[in-house]
Swiss-Prot record:
Assigned protein family: Belongs to the peptidase M43B family.
Region (Metalloprotease): 442-754
Disease: Short stature, Dauber-Argente type: An autosomal recessive disorder characterized by progressive postnatal growth failure, moderate microcephaly, thin long bones, mildly decreased bone density, and elevated serum levels of total IGF1, IGFBP3 and IGFBP5. Levels of circulating free IGF1 are reduced.
PANTHER family assigned to the protein according to its UniProt record, in alphabetical order: LAMGL DOMAIN-CONTAINING PROTEIN, PAPPALYSIN-2
Listed name of the protein: Pappalysin-2
Function field: Metalloproteinase which specifically cleaves insulin-like growth factor binding protein (IGFBP)-5 at the '163-Ser-|-Lys-164' bond. Shows limited proteolysis toward IGFBP-3.
Biased composition (Basic and acidic residues): 89-99
Cellular compartments annotated: Secreted
Residues the record lists as binding Zn(2+): H733, H737, H743
Catalytic residues (UniProt): E734
Upper taxonomic lineage: Eukaryota, Metazoa, Chordata, Craniata, Vertebrata
Pro-peptide positions on chain: 23-234
Length: 1791
């Protein structure tokens, strides 16, 4: 309410503010539609009875960032909220800051006076939430061991029998360090190998049967000092920064006191340059670079880890190579991945390889790149994720080697593109190593050969021996890895499907709950009915009889599914609460927000505070007259100025509608829950509330909502339906939602569009309601199968509809069951989320069978997952162990959040949204689940920008800790700059803070910040200028071994076997890595293993069994087993590397060998046999036997401009296969990769467009494209290749195309209308489904588009190749056929052409011409040396292609080709910077061009020639143009201090020093207090000297009060003498200006001065003056303009505000002073008022008021040359032509 009042007061001022940019308006439109869609979801349709259950959710893009998103959760994932202490339970209300920062209570005072009455008995503190999966070393927590049964004596049993020291070695990865002085074949390894090698470590250990001796000698160390390298066994993990006990076991060759030195780059000016003497020559013909990195979340774009860059040209170029992180193509600040770019000196554009998936922040990753002179490849964790053949030859000539530098942490540009994160090792080779080197070195025997190619192993201790800071920057932080290493990931975590929310949606996991009945064992669940009575305990909301009947119905429905309910009733005695109407989804902030909110349209809210309807006219004399007038009781009249909320005047229970009043008659469900503070940790709480629509029966909280087990969770039911006969199934339905069940009609009636990926057409566990035993069905209240329906998505029948299911909308007399899949989901969620609702204290089950991870003849090693709830400690009541990881790290989400920013009137995006775990479903899209500083004014399309100091959000954590990392989820932002956070302030416990400055962030990867601060961290404050930023959550992670985790006891595990172990007892495993090696095994014997968890003396259910025959193959053994149906086996159980954890090929990958080597094959430029039919990118369109494919040879369009949108681009093969969503700059991007319609929309205003339906076209703007084909035939398919699908982000109407085929007689045949989507590119239309077209011979295709934003790159036609039918169709009579819009595809007359004409090609060899049938012939064409193919029609020929196969059919060759001389074209300027090229001989094959430098650049090198080579590229340059400066110019009034500066040929960066002569100083220091005498000028990158001069000393002018009282001999210059005129007999001594720029004495007023100035004239020139000091001499008056908003300025005598020209720039007057002559200075006659500038300069809109010099010409918004979009958008609709023109005299238009 306070927000709204402030906005109303400010409305007149804000109304003058301009909008943000055009894209800003689009952003708000999307956000506003989100709010309206949320309203729509919450305002229920007719017959709706369930609120939250009906809410449509979009598929989540990043489930790993959400609560319960993966199982088991990674160390980098985030914990669930733990309950607050008991002191929090007593609070009856929460407070939020108002705009002044004061707390405003949300709960009325009379509710806070009696907290006991609200709560009844205070429940016990909730048991803690469970923690993460066990992934760290648990040395902190106790024995890391295994033993038999419950005995404490250790008995030898395989790995379990190893003594403690050895056991640790057997369950952790060992770091080994050695030298390469005497290399051995089995020890030659570089970098760290892929994690799959861990499997071999285990196999070897099992064979040896003992500790350290079992470590394979094949594994090599990490680089240490010179020429040392290490195999990947596992990624490193840093110890705490204070050097505490770590997590590495050191081998005998490793000094544990030293550790492994690594670098941490903070992302701020920490680039390192390799010293030239370290590496004689950087490899240029072939190389391999390997690096272990641990990147932070949030990076520069791009962020360079390492690279080789040009150090001679001083211009930004792609020459060299770079390895780093960047956003995916056309993705903005999202989808960041590892990349490898490379550009030889022969080409002008780099080739960029991008990884197949996002990088993982905070995870050690092995990244490698190779180049062999032809093939470049990128490897991530040993998998080849991208490759290319686009570059060839050496990187540079030998002469240019001196111009290349190796950098770490950034590139050589001014921006730096700094990397942020850890760099562990860097290894450099002079050869391109094979993929096996990165994965399976133990099988690789070329170690000695490779060692000779090793040229650099980076050493970081001491770092300055090999590296030096680049450009005077600083060294990165040096850290040391010590101690034991956390166990690496063995199994990829289970994740939900695309349409899922949690791991209970994972098909593999939920199938176990379906098939293994012990997981669905008996569960007794507690629930609590919250029954509110009056103060005397009378008049409860629901009766005891209602409660009894409902309880019986609940148990009757669930008990047959092993779920029973335990009832408790919580009575609240509070008359105030009892007499208030509680409304679902109607927050007080919505009342009177100038927008009718249907959910608040209730009589007791005054019909939304008058927003929905007014009761009549309110007369002013009725307000505040001691009576409540219904017509005045609204927000517009301030609710009768308080009369209607005065208990002395009216019955406030019926008349008080003011949302700010503590007496109001209504409250929201959220306020009720806030007042009661009933935590949902131990109970499912049942509340009662009404709704505006009486048919709302209930609302529930999803189990994945972050409020599910807080005081804001539970179920809200209508008391009118609760426990009433015929309505008891309503609560059963809502409980189903709480336990994770969707409506059975989800995916049919609940879907976003016809293309919704979660649409359900057949029963499925991955779409719809995620249950395969509930058939798709529409929403219906009829107790029968629904009738077939026909809607916009087509005609659909619904056989087997589950209308009797509790999750349908049928009545109680019809619903009677849950399906087995639904029962499995409910049991899963009870274990995953609600385990503390049960009486049982036993651990939750392990729902996945154990898995085999190692096997020898004598042993078998198994691994298992933790309990599904993630329990890693005993659940001690009241402890914080649920927030601890196994290394003693304590992690916590935000506890309280606040912002001084005024809240949006919609009630969304409040600071509270940033409390708790992240819950935004779709990162990078606007969401209602995040905080945003956006304030929108309804009806004005205006958002209020952040103030000059920025918008801020303060986030506080409950427990201050010694912090290690801060994680921040910034899920959406609008600013183009990545640094949307211009400052991040870390708040410390001692009230101090540390400012980190700006940080780069992505919207789909959380921002992680490594904290190096002293003291305990208590919170963080972030600052931004982006008013549309959205922040979802923040997580604070402590350093290991936190005192808050010191008392936590880990869970133990019991391993059961059938047949039993020799002792007859289960094996108890206490170590945290959940592994066990069984050495009591016999080959060929079948064994069954089960694991159960033990905690607090209780045993959980045994896991589903693993059945394995010892010696049999298994997934992960590195051998592809056909018997198991394996498609690959790379030796691990990790997905995302090409071979999934179930040994299936992943999409886009191919795997070869054993263990499998996997690589991405799509787009690598190589057409392999297995992809010939499927890969259009590598192999082109596959033409089946019996068909012919042809590309369009001619094209016509409705809108064509041969320069802007040439339609010829759609002929031939597509120039690009990349399809993207539409953005306005796409049609202007060069080079064009496709045709875009030239629809004249530039002059169309925003209002014009808003009146049209989304994506629609006006009649005159209809877009059509007609393409013609040379060879008419019977059409079988049409292929349409898209450049863009025309879909604008935020819009949902899919663009379409309607197709017509035109036959040889000119008749059109419709093929229907099809949606366009980049997900289906090319769009393939199967013509065989259209019988009316099959036997017509198609000559052209007409395409009509629904949107002008579509881009087409090519169209292809597939026809039947049957000769008998196609031969007569090759021609058409001249007088036949119709054309479209006057454009004809008729291209030749009829005539008999049965024989193939001879191929007579110059400069070509015709070889192997063979006849393949009557009228059919094939010829292979090869051009001579120095010639290349060129096509005049037909398919697109690759540049410099020399061979082609031509086919002749019915006398017609399929292509017209010729062999033309290779022409390299004029050399691109990027080949040699600052050079001119002279090509007097031409630019064809073997011709030469000379190189000359553009002054002042000087030629370096002896061979200034380029030669055109056979591949169409120029030879490598062997010279460069070095920018040098001549001798610097003479500096007047200065003496040169460095004599060598008088010479010529100064390198860029050279500094010359001068000393200014006495009485002069450096011009740049004129504004500073200290006047510098020493002048430095630098040779700049343009080959010119920096400007510099020495200027005379000038003293400060005397204060204005002395104006007109002094006379000076030479102004205020050096040695000038000034005399004050005081009219005294005694003459005053002169005051001198000294060479220091100071007066010899202070100017003082004459002693005899008296009197005062006359009062300034009132309102002269519309200015009035405020004279608080009076009018005496020296008094100051402040000018104020009578008409705001205006500024007082000083104008010349002959100029007024009306005659002021736009190019004049007057000076603003801050004050006037009464001088000693009793006159005002400046003269008030010269002070005028002109209109103030609006605070929207440089916002993308041309504001006419700002288009003048005084306002800096609106920051460039009114000139196309100064706009990034190059398009001026006038803000005012009636903008005068002159006002909106480009007036800036400095703009290009006015030069």
């Amino acid at each position: 309410m306070m927000c709204l009042k402030i906005l109303r007061i400010s409305l007149a001022i804000l109304a003058g503010w301009a909008l943000c940019s055009a894209n800003s308006e689009l952003g708000w439109t999307r956000k506003k539609s989100l709010v309206e869609r949320e309203h729509l979801n919450q305002v229920l349709l007719e017959g709706e009875r369930c609120w939250l259950g009906a809410k449509v959710r979009r598929p989540r893009a990043s489930p790993q960032h959400h609560l319960f998103g993966v199982y088991p959760s990674r160390a980098g994932n985030y914990l669930r909220p733990y309950p607050v202490g008991e002191q929090e339970i007593h609070h009856t209300g929460r407070s939020k800051p108002d705009t002044e920062g004061n707390a405003v209570s949300l709960v009325p005072p009379d509710l806070t006076e009696n907290p006991a009455g609200l709560r009844g008995a205070v429940e016990e503190p909730a048991a803690p939430w469970v923690g993460d999966s066990p992934i760290g070393q648990s040395e902190l927590l106790g024995d890391d061991d295994a033993y038999l049964g419950n005995q404490r004596s250790k008995e030898s049993l395989g790995e379990a029998g190893i003594q403690k020291g050895s056991a640790m070695a057997a369950t952790t990865t060992t770091a080994i360090f050695t030298t390469l002085n005497e290399p051995k074949p089995e020890t030659q390894r570089r970098g760290w190998a892929k994690s799959r090698q861990r499997r071999q470590v285990w196999k070897r250990r099992a064979e040896d049967g003992q500790g350290d001796s079992g470590i394979s000698s094949h594994f090599q160390p990490w680089p240490k000092h010179s020429l040392k390298h290490r195999v990947k066994k596992s990624p490193p993990e840093e110890s705490n920064q204070n050097g505490g006990e770590g997590s590495y076991r050191e081998a005998e060759t490793f000094n544990s006191q030293v550790g492994l030195p690594i670098l941490y780059f903070s992302g701020r000016r920490e680039r390192l340059l390799l010293r030239p003497e370290v590496l004689a020559e950087i490899p240029r013909e072939a190389f391999t670079v390997e690096a272990w990195v641990k990147p932070e979340g949030g990076q520069n774009n791009p962020a360079i880890i390492a690279g080789v860059f040009d150090n001679c040209s001083h211009t930004v170029s792609d020459k060299g190579w770079a390895l780093g992180i960047r956003s995916g193509k056309d993705k903005g600040k999202r989808d960041a991945r590892f990349f490898f770019s490379l550009c030889t000196d022969r080409v002008k554009k780099a080739t960029i390889l991008i990884s197949h998936s996002r990088y993982q922040p905070g995870t050690w990753t092995h990244v490698a790149a190779t180049y062999d002179g032809r093939h470049m490849a990128l490897y991530v964790d040993g998998t080849q994720v991208a490759s290319s053949l686009d570059q060839s030859g050496p990187l540079n000539s030998p002469f240019m080697a001196s111009c290349r530098s190796l950098l770490l942490g950034g590139d050589s540009s001014e921006d730096g593109h700094y990397f942020r994160g850890h760099l562990g090792t860097l290894v450099f080779w002079s050869t391109a190593l094979p993929q096996s080197h990165f994965q399976h070195s133990s099988q690789h025997s070329s170690g000695e050969e490779e060692a000779t190619d090793l040229v650099l192993t980076a050493s970081f201790e001491p770092v300055n021996t090999e590296w030096v800071p680049f450009r005077d920057e600083k060294y990165p932080r040096l850290e040391v890895l010590q101690g034991f290493e956390p166990e690496p990931e063995i199994l990829s975590p289970l994740q939900p499907p695309l349409c899922g929310q949690t791991v209970c949606d994972n098909v593999e996991l939920i199938s176990q709950y379906n098939g293994y009945w012990p997981l669905r064992g008996e569960k007794v669940i507690r629930y609590q009915v919250v029954n509110i009575c009056d103060d005397e305990g009378l008049n409860p909301i629901v009766s005891e009889e209602q409660i009894r009947l409902q309880h019986e119905a609940l148990n009757e429905a669930f008990s047959r599914y092993n779920i029973s309910w335990q009832l408790s009733v919580h009575q609240v005695h509070n008359s105030t609460l009892r007499h208030r109407v509680v409304l679902v989804n109607c927050e007080p902030s919505k009342i009177g927000n100038d927008h009718c909110d249907p959910e608040c349209e209730h009589p007791l809210t005054g019909y939304d505070g008058g927003d929905c309807r007014l009761q009549g006219r309110c007369y002013s004399w009725n307000r505040r007259d001691g009576l409540c007038h219904v017509e005045c009781n609204n927000m517009l009249n301030d609710f009768d100025d308080g009369d209607c909320c005065d208990p002395q005047v009216a019955d406030v229970r019926k008349t008080c509608f003011d949302p700010d009043s503590p007496k109001r008659a209504y409250m929201s469900v959220k306020e009720l829950k806030e007042a009661l503070q009933l935590n949902s940790t131990h109970f499912l709480n049942i509340y009662f509330a009404s709704s505006v629509r009486e048919d709302l029966a209930g609302a529930a909280t999803w189990p994945w909502d972050k409020d599910a087990v807080t005081h804001l969770g539970g179920i809200v039911l209508s008391p009118a339906y609760y426990g009433m006969p015929g309505h008891t199934d309503t609560m059963i339905h809502e409980v189903g939602h709480v336990l994770g069940l969707y409506h059975v009609f989800k995916g049919v009636s609940e879907r976003e569009s016809c293309n919704d990926p979660c649409k359900e057409t057949v029963p499925s566990m991955e779409t719809g309601d995620l249950c395969a035993d509930t058939a798709p069905t529409p929403k219906s209240e009829l107790c029968r199968e629904p009738e077939p329906t026909s809607d916009t998505c087509g005609f659909t029948r619904f056989p087997g509809a589950p209308f009797t299911n509790y999750m349908s909308y049928t009545d109680d007399n019809c619903t009677d069951n849950f399906t087995p899949n639904q029962v499995a989901r409910m049991h899963c969620y009870l274990d995953l989320v609600y385990q503390q609702w049960t009486e049982s204290r036993k651990p939750t089950p392990i729902p996945i069978p154990p898995m085999v991870i190692g096997q020898t003849n004598k042993s078998l090693t198994i691994h298992w997952l933790p309990p599904i709830s993630g329990v890693v400690y005993d659940r001690a009541s009241g402890s914080l162990c649920g927030a601890c990881t196994e290394d003693g790290t304590f992690r916590q989400y935000v506890h309280t959040a606040s912002s001084r920013r005024v809240c949006d009137s919609s009630g969304y995006w409040t600071p509270e949204e940033a409390v708790g775990p992240p819950d935004v479903d779709q990162p990078c899209e606007p969401s209602l689940q995040a905080w945003s500083p956006e304030v929108h004014l309804y009806h004005m399309n205006m958002t209020v920008p952040c103030p000059t100091e920025g918008c801020s959000l303060e986030l506080l954590f409950q427990h201050p800790v010694q912090a290690d990392t801060l994680t921040l989820w910034v899920t959406s932002f609008f600013m183009e700059s990545s640094q949307v956070l211009f400052d991040t302030e870390i708040l410390l416990e001692n009230k101090e803070s540390v400012h980190l400055g700006p940080l780069d962030t992505f919207c789909d990867i959380p921002l992680t910040i490594k904290l190096h601060v002293d003291g305990k961290v208590s919170g963080v404050k972030v600052y931004t200028f982006d008013e549309r930023i959205e922040i979802d959550a923040a997580l604070l992670t402590s350093q290991p071994h936190s005192p808050l985790c010191s008392g936590c006891r880990p869970v133990r595990y019991q391993v059961l076997r059938d047949p039993p172990f020799a002792s007859g007892l289960p094996v108890v495993v206490t170590h945290s890595h959940r592994k066990f090696t069984d050495v009591e095994v016999t080959p060929g014997q079948m064994y069954q293993y089960q694991v159960l968890a033990e905690a607090g003396g209780e045993l959980g259910e045994a896991s589903p069994p693993l059945n394995h025959i010892h010696g049999a193959p298994y997934c992960g053994d590195g051998k592809v087993s056909e018997r198991l149906g394996e498609e690959c086996d790379d030796g691990d159980l990790v997905s995302g590397d090409g071979c999934s954890k179930v040994c299936e090929l992943e999409e886009g990958f191919n795997c070869v060998g054993e263990p499998s080597l996997c690589y991405m094959y799509e787009g690598d430029g190589i057409c392999e046999p297995f992809e010939r039919k499927t890969s259009i990118v590598d192999c082109g369109i596959y033409t089946p036997k019996g068909y012919l494919d042809q590309w369009a040879t001619r094209a016509y369009s409705s809108h064509e401009d041969k320069k802007k949108c040439p339609v010829s681009l759609v002929t031939g093969e597509p120039h690009s296969l990349i399809c993207t969503s539409y953005h306005p700059d796409l049609p202007n991007h060069r080079p064009l990769t496709g045709w875009f319609p030239c629809v004249a929309s530039e002059n169309e205003t925003q209002d014009d467009r808003s009146e049209q339906p989304e994506g629609s076209l006006k009649k005159e703007d209809e877009v059509w494209l007609k393409v013609c084909f040379n060879r008419p035939g019977e059409a079988r398919a049409i292929f349409i290749f898209l450049t863009t699908d025309g879909l604008v982000p935020g819009e949902h109407q899919q663009p379409t195309v309607t197709l017509y085929l035109t036959d040889v007689r000119g008749s059109n045949h419709s093929l229907g209308t099809y949606g366009l989507s980049c997900q289906h590119n090319p769009l393939i239309i199967n013509v065989t489904h259209h019988q009316n077209v099959l036997f017509h011979h198609t000559t052209s295709v007409l395409l009509n588009f629904s949107s002008p934003r579509v881009g087409i790159s090519a169209v292809a036609l597939r026809t039947s190749s049957r000769i008998g039918l196609s031969a007569p169709s090759n021609c058409i009579s001249e007088d036949e056929g119709q054309n479209h819009q006057g454009q004809s595809c008729i291209h030749r007359p009829c005539g008999k052409q049965d024989s193939c004409p001879s191929l007579l090609l110059d400069h070509a060899d015709v070889v192997n011409c063979t006849s393949i049938g009557p009228g059919l012939m094939k010829c292979a064409i090869t051009c001579q040396r120095g010639f290349a193919l060129q096509a005049s029609s037909g398919q697109y020929i690759r540049p410099m292609q020399k061979e082609i196969l031509l086919t002749c059919s019915s006398g017609h060759w399929d292509q017209n080709v010729s062999c033309l001389p290779v022409d390299c074209g004029v050399p691109d300027p990027s080949l040699v910077n600052y050079a001119n090229f002279s090509c007097s001989e031409g630019t064809k094959f073997l011709k030469r061009c000379s190189i000359s430098c553009v002054p002042p650049a000087k030629l370096q090198g002896l061979s200034p020639w380029l030669t055109c080579l056979e591949d169409g590229l120029w030879s490598l340059p062997e010279v460069y143009c070095k920018l040098e400066c001549d001798a610097p110019p003479i500096i007047l009034n200065a003496n040169l201090l460095l004599p060598h500066c008088l010479q010529d040929n100064h390198d860029v960066g050279t500094i010359c020093k001068y000393e200014c002569k006495p009485g002069y100083y450096v011009a740049e220091s004129a504004e500073g207090k200290v006047r510098n005498k020493l002048l430095k000028i630098q040779c700049l990158e343009g080959g010119i000297w920096e400007q510099g001069s020495c200027i005379p000393v000038v003293c400060e002018p005397p204060p204005p009060v002395f104006e007109g009282m002094y006379e000076c001999t030479n102004g205020f210059s050096l040695d000038s003498q000034c005399v004050l005129n005081c009219n005294q007999e005694r003459e005053k001594l002169p005051i001198l200006c000294t060479k220091e720029g100071l007066w010899t004495q202070e100017f003082k007023l004459c002693e005899n001065l008296q009197g005062e100035c006359p009062p300034p004239p009132s309102e002269l020139n519309s200015v009035e003056y405020k004279c608080e000091q009076g009018y005496g001499i020296g008094a100051v008056c402040s000018p104020l303009c009578v008409i705001p908003p205006s500024d007082p300025v000083m104008l010349p005598e002959n100029i007024t505000a009306d005659t002021l020209e736009h190019w004049m720039e007057p000076v603003k007057v801050q004050s006037i002073v009464c001088t000693g002559r009793r006159q005002w200075h400046p003269d008030p006659v010269l002070v005028h008022c002109i209109q103030s500038c609006e605070p929207f300069q440089a916002d993308g809109w041309c504001d006419t008021i700002n288009n003048r010099a005084y306002c800096h010409y609106d920051g460039g918004d009114c000139c196309s040359s100064t706009l990034s979009s190059k398009k001026v958008i006038p803000f005012a609709a009636d903008c005068d032509l002159d006002e909106c023109t480009c007036r800036d005299p400095k703009a290009e238009e006015n030069q």
